[in-house]
Design a protein with these regions (language model features):
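Intrinsically disordered, low-complexity tails and linkers flanking structured cores
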Residues: 37-40, 65, 69, 82-104
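Short alpha-helical DNA-recognition segment
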Residues: 26-50
């Protein structure tokens, strides 16, 4: 994999994470999933979960996987989470197409 491909993958992952954080902030009450419950599911303290969701902690791929696992177990979240990922994926591809001068 070329350096450019690695960079693009990293950008995409970061975009997904940002989208997840934004959605979590917007939907926390709607989902009925509080930070204490999320912390419990992830086996972390609530302060760390708050730092992660607020963007104050560096995210790793492993941490992202933990979040997906914890959030996916909540039935109300699953559909919205995948919808946000798909939306992010479409935006990312549209950006690449535009950069290459291609029409979607």
């Amino acid at each position: 994999m070329s350096e450019e491909q690695r960079l693009n993958r990293a950008r995409f992952r970061l975009a997904i994470l940002k989208e997840m954080r934004a959605v979590h902030r917007q939907r926390q009450d709607t989902w009925g999933l509080k930070r204490d419950k999320l912390a419990e599911r992830m086996g972390m303290d609530e302060a760390r979960v708050s730092r992660i969701l607020n963007g104050d902690e560096v995210l790793t791929i492993g941490l992202v996987a933990e979040f997906f696992h914890a959030l996916e177990a909540h039935p109300t979240i699953r559909a919205e989470l995948y919808e946000q990922i798909e939306s992010c994926w479409r935006k990312w591809h549209a950006g690449i197409d535009a950069a290459l001068g291609e029409k979607p």
